Amino acid sequence: YAPTISTIQKRGYVEKPDNEGRERNYDQWKMKNGETFVQKFRLPSEAEWEFAARGGRDLAPYPWGGPYARNEQGCVLANFKPMRGDYVEDATAYTAPVESHSPNDYGLYNMSGNVAEWTNTAYDETVYDFSWDLAPDYVYHAKVDDPPALKRKVIRGGSWKDIGYYCQTGTRTFEYSDTAKAYIGFRSVMSYLGRGKS
């Protein structure tokens, strides 16, 4: 995982946060899933995203390890909506600069809050009933004429508009892959890191 969102500049996109240090949001899941990336980059699976979000803390509900969304002083630990209609308790109404909150133990920022993140995993309410028997990832690339239920993709991490529940590393929800939302972004992964053949 890259600590910030990474895309390919040659295609007219950027490979860094905007000039105010905020994460970028992009249109449509399809654009994020391969059409803008060189083959080495892709969206993470839901399992890969959760592994990275936990930062080595296997049973922790949040990337920072604790069971609460606030520290001992009462400060929020991510950019999310702590109470009904309360978007500015952390001093930002929408997306915050990337380094506004501490990274997890892998050095990854905003694995909870700020913007939710697309995964490559297709959303189905019953996926946990069969996915572990078959494979840890459930992928389906919807066709244009497929029904809306087949166009759902898992998003993880919660955003500035979500309550703390959606910021938990084990919480999943969905969005339709052909929609654009100001509160959903992505981070890319590389399929292989290491040396080539000698």
Feature annotation, model-predicted:
Residues Y1-T7:
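Short amphipathic alpha-helical interaction segments
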Residues K10, E20-T169, R195-S198:
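Functional-site microenvironments in short loops/helix caps that host divalent-cation chemistry
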Residues E15-K16:
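Short beta-strand "wing" residues that participate in macromolecule-binding interfaces
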